[in-house]
């Protein structure tokens, strides 16, 4: 539809050019005519549809945007013991709300893997001293297509609210991995994995041990690639308030029973939060992190490592020390150039087909009357990606219920503190296949909110030839959704405030999900209720 409108726009533009050519008086009017046509095309090419408010969708509700199933949009919703799937049409009109009555009372976690016209729903629940990991198939109408199937069970020592199993899948969704991590003692973990294909047929069941040097061991992301290979990083810190001084890359081939451990030599560096990403195009693993040169010092640069699966060797390793010009791009309006990256966090690692990759970071912090902002707590505190509890079970950070908390997600211990959340500039770095920096650029924004970070930060989606960032900006005391794109050469195009915005809806872009090449679903808050908007570009 947008391409057709674009052709019509070009046709009209050509006719205007023929009429105006050679006529100076008419040429004076050309700018306003062309501007009007361009604005008309921009308005037509962008479309926003809002769902109606459902009085059952309170702001305390947990939810997950499942995605596009057939011609429908499916959203999972949970409030207390109620579980439903709401099915919307292409204009976000509610077609049905399907209760998931088969779910037991004590559901610990729910995950969805969407395909073209169905989705797998994997959930875990506890019955007496047994935790079950089960699966059902959901059709495009939100209805159950199969009886529940138990994928695995685990014995536990009593009642608990924490999940045991984690689920990850490959980029092409043809490999699905369910795993659990049991802490045996202070220095030993046992990891059990179940690898399935996209028919949910079991391909491989494995179990292996991991040794850590002390109680300060932490793990990175857990990933599975299109071949079914499993990878994660095992990190070591010298203390609970320190950064990473040692990391091993742990790799298990899909059909193997043993693991390969690749030590990473950090020399004089210590690392911040470590991010991993599979490059399925080139059979590589990309690892990246900010690094420090001094204890309690400033972030000095960006460390990157590329590990080649085929040769099982390190293909590239780079330390990018930030220049003053990069620091000027990254810092906040009132920030210091030396500390420009101290509040930046890596949000995305994006591989491309030629072996290069992009790294996206965001400036993010909070302030409180009672407690100063602490990067250590954000990275290693309870509920965060690197948290490693020392009870019977260790579980990875893929708990979808955590994060959909609209009230002060840093208030982990019940204090009623006033908290202001701040999210500012986005930095994008692009490296070639050898790990050399090709370009960097900044998307400038200035966001803050009190008592909740649900309306700040951003969401990105990839259209193939560019990456689009969506984020709120305050204009005349109102939060308005903004858009900016960056192309393969690092050129940024900042679009004006999105058209057709309903000022009564507050967007929460960080919880959005891309459901098509140019379509994204974003949750909104309307008064005290959650609803959803579909945006097409």
Could you tell me what each predicted segment is?
Residues 56-69, 111-116, 125, 163-173, ...:
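Structural signature of eukaryotic scaffold interfaces centered on beta-propeller domains
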Residues 290, 347-349, 356-365, 404-425, ...:
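Loop/turn-rich, solvent-exposed surfaces of beta-rich toroidal or solenoidal domains
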Residues 81-86, 128-136, 186-193, 240-250, ...:
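Structural motif
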Residues 263-272, 316-341, 441-458, 489-516:
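Conserved blade-ending motifs and adjacent loop-strand segments that build the rim/top face
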Residues 133-141, 190-201, 244-257, 300-313, ...:
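Beta-propeller blade signature
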Residues 68-80, 117-126, 173-185, 228-239, ...:
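Short beta-strand elements that form the blades of beta-propeller/WD-repeat-like
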Residues 52-85:
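Beta-strand-rich domains and repeat architectures in extracellular enzymes and scaffolds
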Residues 93-131, 148-161, 209-218, 444-445:
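Blade-loop segments of beta-propeller domains
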């Amino acid at each position: 539809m947008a391409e057709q409108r674009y052709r019509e726009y070009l046709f009209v533009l050509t006719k205007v050019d023929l009429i105006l050519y050679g006529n100076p008086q008419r040429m004076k009017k050309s700018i306003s005519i062309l501007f009007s046509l361009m604005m008309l095309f921009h308005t037509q090419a962008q479309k926003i549809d809002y769902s109606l408010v459902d009085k059952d969708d309170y702001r305390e509700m947990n939810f997950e945007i499942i995605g596009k199933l057939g011609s429908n949009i499916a959203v999972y919703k949970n409030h207390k013991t109620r579980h439903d799937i709401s099915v919307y049409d292409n204009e976000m009109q509610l077609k049905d709300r399907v209760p998931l009555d088969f779910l037991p009372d004590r559901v610990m976690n729910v995950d969805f893997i969407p395909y073209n016209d169905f989705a797998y729903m994997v959930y875990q629940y506890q019955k007496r001293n047994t935790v079950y990991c089960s699966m059902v198939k959901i059709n495009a109408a939100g209805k159950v297509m199969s009886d529940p199937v138990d994928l695995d069970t685990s014995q536990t020592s009593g009642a608990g609210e924490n999940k045991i199993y984690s689920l990850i899948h490959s980029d092409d969704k043809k490999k699905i991995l369910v795993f659990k991590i049991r802490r045996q003692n202070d220095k030993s973990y046992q990891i059990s994995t179940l690898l399935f294909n996209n028919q949910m047929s079991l391909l491989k069941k494995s179990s292996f041990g991991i040794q850590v040097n002390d109680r300060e061991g932490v793990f990175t992301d857990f990933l599975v690639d299109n071949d079914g290979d499993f990878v994660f990083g095992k990190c070591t810190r010298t203390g609970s308030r320190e950064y990473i001084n040692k990391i091993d890359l742990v790799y298990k081939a899909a059909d193997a029973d043993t693991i390969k451990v690749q030590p990473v030599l950090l020399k004089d560096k210590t690392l911040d939060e470590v991010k991993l990403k599979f490059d399925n195009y080139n059979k590589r693993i990309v690892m990246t992190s900010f690094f420090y040169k001094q204890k309690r010092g400033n972030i000095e640069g960006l460390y990157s490592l590329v590990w080649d699966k085929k040769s099982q060797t390190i293909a590239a390793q780079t330390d990018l020390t930030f220049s003053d010009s990069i620091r000027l791009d990254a810092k906040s309006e009132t920030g210091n150039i030396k500390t420009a990256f101290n509040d930046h966090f890596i949000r995305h690692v994006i591989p491309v087909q030629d072996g290069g990759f992009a790294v996206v970071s965001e400036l993010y912090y909070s302030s409180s009357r009672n407690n100063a902002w602490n990067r250590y707590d954000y990275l290693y505190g309870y509920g965060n990606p690197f948290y490693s509890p020392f009870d019977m079970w260790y579980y990875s950070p893929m708990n979808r219920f955590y994060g959909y908390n609209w009230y002060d997600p840093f208030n982990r211990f019940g204090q009623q503190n006033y908290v202001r959340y701040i999210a500012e500039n986005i930095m994008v770095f692009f490296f070639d296949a050898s790990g050399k920096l090709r370009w960097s650029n900044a998307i400038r924004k200035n966001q803050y909110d009190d008592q909740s970070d649900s309306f700040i930060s951003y969401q990105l989606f990839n259209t193939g030839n560019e990456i689009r960032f969506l984020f709120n900006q305050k204009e005349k005391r109102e939060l308005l959704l903004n858009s900016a794109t960056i192309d393969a050469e690092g050129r940024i195009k900042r679009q004006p405030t999105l058209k057709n915005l309903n000022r009564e809806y507050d967007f929460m872009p960080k919880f959005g999900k891309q459901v098509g090449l140019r379509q994204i679903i974003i949750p909104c808050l309307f008064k005290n209720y959650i609803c959803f908007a579909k945006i097409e570009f």
